[in-house]
Amino acid sequence: MSWIERILNKSNITQTRKASIPEGVWTKCDSCGQVLYRAELERNLEVCPKCDHHMRMSARARLHMLLDAGSEVELGSELEPKDILKFKDSKKYKDRLSAAQKETGEKDALVAMKGTLQGMPIVAASFEFAFMGGSMASVVGARFVRAVEQALEDNCPLVCFSSSGGARMQEALMSLMQMAKTSAALAKMQERGLPYISVLTDPTMGGVSASLAMLGDINIAEPKALIGFAGPRVIEQTVREKLPPGFQRSEFLIEKGAIDMIVRRPVMRQTLASILSKLTHQPQPSVDGVKADAAVADNPGDA
């Protein structure tokens, strides 16, 4: 035994261990860098309580946020994508599909459901951005059309949350065809006088923004959502000019009249219920607690 070990009895030395924290307990805000408790962030509908940054949200979480609990019935869940073209870039398309399905638990990039919103029958669809960038392909178009057909059958409104990079290049013309297919389906909604509300979230780009996302009777956007056809960097390289600050963000678009409203996520459900009740000539829903729909205050400074 060395002299220092004799001086410092091992029994008196406290052994310290690095605390192990399970993955997914904490996360960081993409905007302000604040470290956030994951469970609290989920209660806040993925909105940072410090800076009010609206983070990306899964398709199912959006639909569960919107529809009354226990009323949800999924539409088109049996539809699955196929690699008809046997497409391969740096990776086979079928392998990309398998990886995306494993990561998200979804078969493709759109989830559609029917249900009720504060007692009103509605049909809702939502893009899953984590699935290949929410790209629009054959199954996405088919599910959206299924949602439109259900709304026509039930004589009720349709709400769609868009979050997409555009058409899926691995399906080539079949993905581009969905722009016309979904637009034609929405024309039937217009003929019947049924409301279609489009909610644009970050990001809504490419073929989705050029079709179903901008065809709403009312187009709503979340704060600071990136909305456009080509991305800002592509435009800058093409026109060789510096774009103005906030270009293609929802605040810029509402100034130019491209969208109708900007609505924060905590009050989105109540806002949609209020709009749809007016458009369908139903009694105005109760507003006893717009804040009951989320744990985030209307003013982030109050949180």
Curated annotation (Swiss-Prot):
EC number: 2.1.3.15
Any GO BP annotation: fatty acid biosynthetic process
Binding site for Zn(2+): 29, 32, 48, 51
Cofactor: Zn(2+)
The keyword Plastid appears for this protein: no
Low complexity compositional bias, start-end: 287-303
Pfam families, alphabetized: Carboxyl_trans, Zn_ribbon_ACC
Zn finger region (C4-type): 29-51
Subcellular location, record wording: Cytoplasm
Major location (coarse): cytoplasm
Reaction catalyzed: N(6)-carboxybiotinyl-L-lysyl-[protein] + acetyl-CoA = N(6)-biotinyl-L-lysyl-[protein] + malonyl-CoA
Pathway: Lipid metabolism; malonyl-CoA biosynthesis; malonyl-CoA from acetyl-CoA: step 1/1
Gene3D superfamilies (alphabetical): 2-enoyl-CoA Hydratase, Chain A, domain 1 (3.90.226.10)
Any one annotated GO CC term: acetate CoA-transferase complex
Cross-referenced PROSITE patterns: COA_CT_NTER (PS50980)
CoA carboxyltransferase N-terminal domain mapped to chain residues: 25-294
Cofactor binding description: Binds 1 zinc ion per subunit.
Family: Belongs to the AccD/PCCB family.
Subunit structure: Acetyl-CoA carboxylase is a heterohexamer composed of biotin carboxyl carrier protein (AccB), biotin carboxylase (AccC) and two subunits each of ACCase subunit alpha (AccA) and ACCase subunit beta (AccD).
Record-linked NCBIfam families: accD
Protein name per its UniProtKB record: Acetyl-coenzyme A carboxylase carboxyl transferase subunit beta
